[in-house]
Amino acid sequence: MLWVIDGLVYGFFTAIYTLFNQHYKLNGYVLGIWRGFGISLAFMPFLYFFPVPESAYYWFLLIFQGLLIGVYDSHLFFASADFGAGPTSRFMAITALVTTFLWWFLTPEQFEHLLGNGTVVISLILVLFGFTVSYWQMVQSPVSQKLVRYILPAVFALAGMSIATKEIAVHSQSGVWGAIIYYLVVALFVSGCYNLFFYFRTQKKHGFKQFVADVFNRRTVWPGIYMVAFSAALITAKTLALRVAPNPGYVTALLLVAPIFVYVLN
């Protein structure tokens, strides 16, 4: 059950992650650039200690994961700045449900096995009812409706990330630590490229000089360094948990503690 502890650590760092841009209110793409390229460069030397993956499927997972991270990061950073960390983290909790059902769709034999247990079926019905009521309450205000429309891509991105992370950890040729290093270097580099592309796409009037000023000004550098540090811890805890958890949705469900941490830390 060590994955439960790792999952709770994941929830704690997710709370910090969500609170971050509520405080700094930086451009979400700029933070994504820092997180992506910063982590990738910091951990690149460790690639020397692990063999290069030979599986094309494994490289596809890493690249696909990077694109999902780019979607998730940018939406989460902008949402926490515009709507606050509390509402954002509470709505992201619905990812647990999406991840669980997506995993069962991909592994129907596990779902069929669970259906043989009446207690589990009743529990699922109660969970579905609870999520439905919570979702209905969240979307009653105009602010929540705007948040839902904006953050929904991040919900599906995080669900996909959770499943891809488990696959990356399970199919690693060099153990879980090799999986973590390749995740930190390759997937995060791809996410940095994603955010770089959308930065220039949305800031068309900005040239290279303005880009350098936005990324390396005093107001951005220290938050960027902090982001690199605790994001690496978040990814490590998440990968360790997802590798052994029977369903990625169970680990994502531990993100339900994130709104509590947000409330305490806010």
Where are each of the predicted segments found?
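Glycine-/small-residue-enriched transmembrane alpha-helix faces in small-molecule transporters
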Residues: M1-V30, L67, V71, H75, ...
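C-terminal ends of transmembrane helices
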Residues: T14-L26, G70-S89, F131-V143, L196-Q210, ...
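Hydrophobic transmembrane alpha-helices of multi-pass small-molecule transporters
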Residues: T18, S40-L47, D73, L97-W104, ...
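Hydrophobic core positions of alpha-helical segments in small-molecule transporters
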Residues: I33-R35, F64, F91-I94, I122, ...
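Hydrophobic transmembrane alpha-helices of multi-pass small-molecule transport proteins
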Residues: G38-F43, I94, V98-F105, L114-Q137
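Specific transmembrane alpha-helical segments of multi-pass solute transporters/efflux pumps
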Residues: M44-M92, V98-L102, A157-A164, V221-N247
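Membrane-interface helix termini and inter-helical loops of multi-pass transporters
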Residues: Y48-Y57, T107-G116, A164-I180, H206-D214, ...
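C-terminal transmembrane-helix exit sites in multi-pass transporters
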Residues: F50, T95-V120, L240, V244, ...
